[in-house]
Each structure stands twice: as C-alpha cells, then as structure tokens.
C-alpha cells in the first residue's frame, strides 16, 4: 500500500485524537493500521508536509513515543512541541476537509520534511 494512502488512513485517527485532546503512541498507531512502529515516520511525513504547506497545526505532533511522550526525530514542523500540541488540540479539525491521497503525495513531493531541519524547511518556504 502506498504511503500516501496509509497517511490518508492516519489523518482521521489524528483528527479524532486532536478533538479529544489526546496523543497517540507510535505503538498504538502501528497496531491500529497494521504497520510496524518503525515504519510510521515515513507515513507521517505527508501529513507533516501537508500541514506545513496549509498553515495548519502539525497533526503529526500528536504521535508520540510511549516513554518520552514526544514525537520522534522526524517531527520537525515546530520547535516547541507542547505549544504545537496545544495548537492542534484547539484547531477546528472537524471543519477541515481531510486531504486526499493525491494532496498528501503532492505535499510530500513539494516539501519533503523527513530528515530536514526546521530551518531548512523555513528556507524552502521563504520564511
């Protein structure tokens, strides 16, 4: 299954978490979608890129390690994780149309975010 399709499956899970003001562990997310936790960063990249390009709080900030309570090293959409989580909790996600598989693929292609720094991303966006 393509990563963009998996990302499209993850989106509603994350919006539900945001509405309920909850985080989701990598382990639980992996079990919910049938993917090993080690492969989730690759699947969260299109969501992170889409949120950055659309000026939305980064939904991927809600996926955290069980022990650390923090997103993995691939999360670079914001330097202040607690503030970004608070922004994601406050956002009106039920009013946002979920992105399509094609929109997620386009976002990841236009702004590949995994493995880049926040400074590099801002530079790519001209910010």
Name each model-derived stretch.
Residues 1-9, 15-18, 22-127:
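Nucleic acid-binding interface residues in structured DNA/RNA-binding domains
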């Amino acid at each position: 299954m393509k990563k963009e399709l998996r990302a499209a499956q993850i989106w509603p899970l994350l919006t539900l978490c945001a509405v309920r003001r909850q985080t989701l562990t990598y382990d639980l997310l992996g079990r919910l979608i049938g993917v090993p936790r080690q492969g989730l960063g690759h699947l969260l990249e299109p969501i992170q890129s889409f949120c950055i390009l659309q000026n939305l709080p980064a939904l991927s900030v809600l996926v955290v390690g069980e022990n650390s309570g923090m997103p993995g090293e691939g999360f670079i959409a914001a330097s202040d994780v607690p503030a970004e989580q608070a922004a994601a909790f406050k956002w009106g996600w039920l009013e946002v149309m979920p992105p399509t598989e094609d929109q997620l693929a386009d976002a990841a292609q236009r702004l590949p975010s995994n493995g880049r720094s926040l400074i590099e991303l801002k530079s790519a966006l001209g910010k």
